[in-house]
């Protein structure tokens, strides 16, 4: 089942099922698809300007790193990402840029899902957003990101989504 839906979605479905069985409110299902051509998610891309992962030299223990990835995948509220960021800083020190990017991506995903956005794609700085089955355009065309670096693009992307839903 995990390979069919992906680890993150599987964890969320499991979390929702447990909440339903306990009679609790079911958490949001965060299934927004992100396709960001300026982000590199593999540890093998270390040193790349858009790398987003948890480096071994930041969290040496493999189990701890996997637990961090799991918490990111299971997060359904922006507060959870903020709490994880604070916990990581308290336990391991200042976040490396790659970890900060990874958390920013998770935040964007949750923010998008909260507002019914199914797809957020950035291709050659062109921003493609799909909500309620329709593409969101600015004056009959897709918006473009103006920032030149990955961190600036992530910030601009988050701000654009916040403005879109305001």
Question: PLM features: what roles do these ranges have?
Answer:
Residues 1-166:
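Accessory helical-bundle/CTD segments and flexible terminal tails appended to RecA-like ATPase motors
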């Amino acid at each position: 089942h995990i390979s069919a839906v992906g680890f993150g979605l599987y964890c969320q479905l499991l979390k929702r099922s447990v909440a339903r069985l306990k009679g609790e409110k079911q958490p949001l299902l965060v299934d927004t698809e992100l396709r960001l051509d300026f982000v590199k998610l593999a540890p093998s891309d270390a040193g790349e300007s858009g790398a987003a992962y948890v480096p071994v030299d930041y969290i040496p223990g493999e189990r701890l790193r996997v637990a961090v990835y799991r918490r990111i995948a299971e997060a359904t509220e922006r507060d959870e990402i903020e709490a994880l960021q604070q916990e990581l800083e308290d336990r391991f020190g200042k976040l490396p840029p790659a970890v900060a990017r990874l958390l920013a991506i998770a935040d964007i995903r949750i923010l998008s899902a909260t507002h019914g956005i199914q797809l957020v794609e950035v291709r050659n700085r062109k921003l493609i957003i799909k909500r309620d089955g329709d593409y969101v355009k600015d004056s009959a065309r897709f918006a473009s990101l103006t920032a030149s670096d990955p961190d600036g693009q992530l910030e601009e992307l988050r701000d654009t989504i916040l403005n879109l839903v305001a």
